[in-house]
Curated annotation (Swiss-Prot):
The lineage of its organism: Bacteria, Bacillati, Bacillota, Bacilli, Bacillales. Belongs to the metallo-dependent hydrolases superfamily. DHOase family. Class I DHOase subfamily. Zn(2+) 1 binds at H59, H61, D151, D304. PROSITE patterns: DIHYDROOROTASE_1, DIHYDROOROTASE_2. It comes from Bacillus licheniformis (strain ATCC 14580 / DSM 13 / JCM 2505 / CCUG 7422 / NBRC 12200 / NCIMB 9375 / NCTC 10341 / NRRL NRS-1264 / Gibson 46). This is Dihydroorotase. Gene3D superfamilies: Metal-dependent hydrolases (3.20.20.140), Urease, subunit C, domain 1 (2.30.40.10). The gene is pyrC. InterPro entries: Amidohydro-rel, DHOase, DHOase/Allantoinase_Hydrolase, Dihydroorotase_CS, Metal-dep_hydrolase_composite, Metal_Hydrolase. GO terms for biological process: 'de novo' UMP biosynthetic process; purine nucleobase catabolic process. SUPFAM superfamilies: Composite domain of metallo-dependent hydrolases, Metallo-dependent hydrolases. Catalyzes the reversible cyclization of carbamoyl aspartate to dihydroorotate.
Length: 428
């Protein structure tokens, strides 16, 4: 199938808007320039639309296998397509865990059968994510593992993490870490701050995260491993990562939209749609995250899309599971609150969600160039709509942003040369 995307605008290397047409043949971009339609070619009129590389999210939870009531690979991929994402990386805290070559092969086949966008599967660092016995890294890599993580829990012992890092380095794969010292969680459900005190809740202190990162960057230095910090959330953590980068340690970090947009002072009562892990931190932490993103300490943005059933989220703040969904709201929220207000340029947001995650992990995506995969998102920057969780394609409706008015909604998503979302509906 051949497509010609005409009349839209792209960003050049300086962030200037330039009008360009894009020809797609098969699964790749074949030409970019001022182009005329060829015979039999399908023309997509992108007049007034921002033509972006497909967005990239390297931290999602699709729950399959074992959690299909919350999400499946198919529904998660549909949510990604609606949100403008063409490449996502799925975390391994499923049941069973992808901790064997056979389980990874099953997962890769399931992705091929049901996903409308590119889904990169993480493998677990330890068997069943228990932290006790390391998985077969070589076998999992051969079966298609993107990287290794026990996300959902932190690897508690330094010895296990060090051995995992050495093994990962030997096969040129990254260790991706959920950073949390279990002895410092204290049964918490929110940040250990004013909100916790006012509502009589156990709090999770900032040091719970930062102390794990401090340990791990030293282990990564010793092992020669690429170490990536998931969903960084505290000013202390930002300081540790900044210092590690200055020391030449190969560390990267991501931050979520919700940690950039909200702090614990924004939680309206005991609303479990504001419960996630790591929790919303203090306003000072939020400012440190924004500064870390600006100065390059934090490399890119990832949603940590974490769907749950409505029944689960109707429990108390202490009992409800951690997590919110984010794939269908990330770009509009960030564009509205940071680009429309002049705090960021469109180029900065574009890079945080396309170029930079791909550069961090050496992925050949995130750019619009001839010869690259035809992963393209058309975004209407002027369209204003309210977030309506009832329209989500994800099974999860657990969002704190329901009803918020946003600009910058994806109008069409093309993944690997196939139209997967267009004008408010999926393209079959």
């Amino acid at each position: 199938m051949s497509y010609l995307i005409k009349n839209g605008f792209m960003l050049d290397e300086k962030g200037e808007k330039v009008q360009r047409d894009i020809r797609v043949e098969g699964d790749a971009i074949s030409e970019i320039g001022s182009l005329e339609a060829a015979s039999g070619e399908t023309v997509i009129d992108a007049d007034g639309l921002f033509v972006s590389p497909g967005l990239v999210d390297l931290h999602v939870h699709f729950r399959e296998p074992g959690g299909e009531k919350k999400e499946t690979i198919e529904t998660g991929a549909k949510a990604a397509a609606r949100g403008g994402f063409t490449t996502v990386a799925a975390m391994p805290n499923t049941r069973p865990v992808p901790d064997t070559k056979e389980q990874m092969e099953w997962l890769v086949n399931r992705i091929d059968e049901t996903a409308s966008v590119r889904v990169l599967p993480y493998a677990s660092i330890t068997i069943r994510q228990t932290g006790r016995e390391m998985t077969d890294f070589e076998g999992l890599k051969d079966a298609g593992a993107f990287a290794f993580t026990d996300d959902g829990v932190g690897v508690q012992t330094a010895g296990m993490m060090y051995e995992a890092m050495k093994k990962a380095a030997s096969i040129n794969k990254a260790i991706v870490a959920h950073c949390e010292d279990n002895s410092l969680i204290y049964g918490g459900s929110v940040h250990d701050g004013e909100f916790a005190k006012a509502n009589g809740l156990n709090g999770i202190p900032s040091v719970c995260e930062a102390v794990h990162i401090a340990r791990d960057v030293l282990l990564a230095e010793a092992a020669g491993c690429h170490y990536h910090v998931c969903h960084i959330s505290t000013k202390e953590s930002v300081r540790v990562v900044r210092d590690a980068k200055k020391a030449g340690i190969r560390v990267t970090a991501e931050v979520t939209p919700h940690h950039l947009l909200l702090s614990d002072s924004d939680i309206p009562g005991l609303d479990t749609n504001y419960k996630m892990n790591p929790p919303l931190r203090s306003p000072e932490d939020r400012e440190a995250l924004l500064e870390g993103l600006r100065d390059g300490t934090i490399d890119f943005i990832a949603t940590d899309h974490a769907p749950h059933t409505e029944e689960e989220k109707q429990q108390t703040m202490s009992l409800a599971p951690f997590g919110i969904v984010g794939l269908e709201t990330a770009f509009p929220l960030l564009y509205t609150h940071f680009v429309k207000t002049g705090k960021w340029t469109l180029k900065q947001l574009h890079d945080y969600m396309t170029v930079k995650p791909c550069e961090a992990f050496g992925l050949p995506y995130g750019k619009l160039e001839a010869g690259r995969s035809a992963d393209i998102t058309l975004i209407d920057l002027e369209r204003e709509e309210k977030i309506d969780k009832s329209t989500f394609l994800s099974k999860g409706k657990n969002t704190p942003f329901d009803g918020i008015s946003c600009f910058g909604w994806p109008a069409m998503t093309m993944a690997k040369g196939k139209l997967v979302y267009q004008e408010g509906r999926l393209v079959k």
